[in-house]
Regions:
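Short beta-strand segments
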Residues: 22-64, 72, 78-82, 92-94
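Solvent-exposed residues in well-ordered beta-strands and their adjoining turns
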Residues: 45, 63, 83, 99-101, ...
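Alpha-helix boundary recognition
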Residues: 18-19, 73-74, 114
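Short helix-to-loop capping/linker segments positioned immediately adjacent to catalytic or ligand/cofactor-binding
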Residues: 13, 25-31, 120-126
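A short beta-turn/loop motif at secondary-structure boundaries
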Residues: 32-34, 84-88, 127-129
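Short, basic/aromatic recognition patches
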Residues: 2-25
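Charged, gly/pro-rich active-site loop segments
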Residues: 2-9, 90-159
Length: 159
């Protein structure tokens, strides 16, 4: 591995993880300091940045008052791990912070994720009693293990 495999920039090969049906495993910190990990649907957007151009922000849609939302409200540090659905040896781990929580567009966003992950036009578990919320994560450190290091392992696995 080389220094290019550790970055703070979501490069195109890393962004591809967010385009498929790859689950993100979101790690947050519980009140007692222990880790809490949740598999979750995950998304990415480009955000306008005033002087540095564009920055990519990771979106996680959850329900208000779920444990992960409570945890990031108290401690915004998160870790996200993803593996490529086509090559589970290719992976990315992202450390970052939740920089914003918003309900704006959260219902529409969960429908968008349902389309990608379930091929459904609408999220099947919509409920008027559950308020959706989007967690916006700014990456601070990224580790990427690209296919050039993992193709051999994948070939061995298919034998």
């Amino acid at each position: 591995m080389n220094k290019d495999d550790n970055t703070t920039i979501l490069t195109e090969p890393i962004v591809k993880f967010f385009r498929g049906k790859n689950f993100g495993f979101l790690g947050t910190v519980n009140k007692d300091g222990s880790p809490q990990v949740t598999p979750t649907w995950i998304d990415i957007i480009e955000k306008e940045e005033n002087k540095d151009g564009h920055e990519k922000i990771i979106l996680i849609n959850t329900a208000r008052d779920r444990l992960k939302q409570k945890n990031v409200s108290r401690d915004p540090r998160v870790s996200i791990s993803m593996v490529d659905e086509d090559n589970p040896y290719s992976m990315v781990t992202i450390k970052g912070r939740v920089v914003e929580q918003t309900t704006d567009g959260a219902d529409e966003h969960i429908d968008k994720l349902a389309k990608r992950y379930l091929s459904a036009d609408r999220y099947p578990a919509h409920s008027p009693t559950i308020k959706r919320i989007i967690l916006k994560v700014k990456p601070e450190k990224i580790f990427y293990l690209p296919p050039r290091y993992t193709d051999y392992l994948q070939k061995l696995n298919k034998k």
